[in-house]
Swiss-Prot record:
EC assignment: 1.17.4.1
Taxonomic source organism: Vaccinia virus (strain Copenhagen)
Classification lineage: Viruses, Varidnaviria, Bamfordvirae, Nucleocytoviricota, Pokkesviricetes
Catalytic reaction(s) noted: a 2'-deoxyribonucleoside 5'-diphosphate + [thioredoxin]-disulfide + H2O = a ribonucleoside 5'-diphosphate + [thioredoxin]-dithiol
Cross-referenced InterPro entries: Ferritin-like_SF (IPR009078), RNR-like (IPR012348), RNR_small (IPR033909), RNR_small_AS (IPR030475), RNR_small_fam (IPR000358)
Protein's UniProt name: Ribonucleoside-diphosphate reductase small chain
Record: residues binding Fe cation 1: 70, 101, 104
Length: 319
């Protein structure tokens, strides 16, 4: 039995902290909280109306995938991870992650609602898991892992792949629009969401390091390469990025680059050994590490949450 999954009678009380590295991840997530009301999408409509039909088609399908996927991640957290993991610090993170995923889902739904005026098309996009085969394939893969009988370690890798690989190419495609100076609301929300997902992915890697009996390297490689092939097919065949003027072969390479970064973070050898083909993704590539986080995307970070000085109470102060 993994220690982090073992029955823990102290799980209802936060202090004393036992796992400081996990607790610090929770505080980092807390410091980056945001809401959809803080994203101004009013200027997007002018840009939206100037996009080509292909560009609109691409963005709508990407948003449809995103709108559904956060709910799938949350279902896994609610049904599996939150009940399995018994250490309080990780439960704090997972609870906060669920709130953040709801905000992501609301943001994507609001973007669809703003850009798409036809109610039938809206319904089609909101029900992408049933209506779009390319989205269904990714959703089915993620949902399969919620109900899989595999151990926590394997499912941890699968959902790290969902958040680290299944989202990566779509994030890159929206950053490509930012490079062109288009859709400021969409691209700003993409910065916030990609930062959050990078942190969630880092958290999965941290939890993996706490396992005493992790899955084998062969198992990890199998899950990650499976996710890579599905994501490559999604963005080069089902919903090709050439629709927005991106190079499909470079996108394939980028997804492999992101997968290598993930598997390295898990402590294993790289699979693809490729370099990042997108210079504009240099600081983003779902690294989720402090260098990206501390940029405080859009200068946004909750005041004082990460400030250590505020946490000390002294009776020596002159009142």
């Amino acid at each position: 039995m993994e220690p982090i999954l073992a029955p823990n009678p102290n799980r209802f009380v936060i202090f004393p902290i036992q796992y400081y590295d996990i607790w610090n991840m929770y505080k980092k997530a807390e410091a980056s909280f945001w809401t959809v009301e803080e994203v101004d999408i009013s200027k997007d409509i002018n840009d939206w109306n100037k996009l080509t039909p292909d560009e609109k088609y691409f963005i709508k399908h990407v948003l449809a995938f995103f709108a559904a996927s956060d709910g799938i991640v949350n279902e896994n957290l609610a049904e599996r991870f939150c009940t399995e993991v018994q250490i309080t610090e990780a439960r704090c993170f997972y609870g906060f992650q669920m709130a953040i995923e709801n905000i992501h889902s609301e943001m994507y739904s609001l973007l669809i609602d703003t850009y798409v005026k036809d109610s039938n098309e809206k319904n089609y996009l909101f029900n992408a898991i049933e209506t779009m085969p390319c989205v269904k394939k990714k959703a089915d893969w993620a949902q399969k892992w919620i109900h899989d009988s595999a151990g926590y370690g394997e499912r941890l890798i699968a959902f790290a792949a969902v958040e680290g690989i299944f989202f990566s190419g779509s994030f890159a495609s929206i950053f490509w629009l930012k490079k062109r100076g288009l859709m400021p609301g969409l691209t700003f929300s993409n910065e916030l969401i990609s930062r959050d997902e990078g942190l969630h992915c880092d958290f999965a890697c941290l939890m993996f390091k706490h396992l005493l009996y992790p899955p084998s390297e062969e198992t990890v490689r199998s899950i990650i390469t499976d996710a890579v092939s599905i994501e490559q097919e999604f963005l080069t065949a089902a919903l090709p990025v050439k629709l927005i003027g991106m190079n499909c072969e470079m996108m394939k390479t980028y997804i492999e680059f992101v997968a290598d970064r993930l598997i390295s973070e898990l402590g294993f050898k790289k699979i693809y050994n490729v370099t990042n083909p997108f210079d504009f993704m240099e600081n983003i590539s779902l690294e989720g590490k402090t260098n990206f986080f501390e940029k405080r995307v859009g200068e946004y970070q909750k005041m004082g949450v990460m400030s250590q000085e505020d946490n000390h109470f002294s009776l020596d102060v002159d009142f």
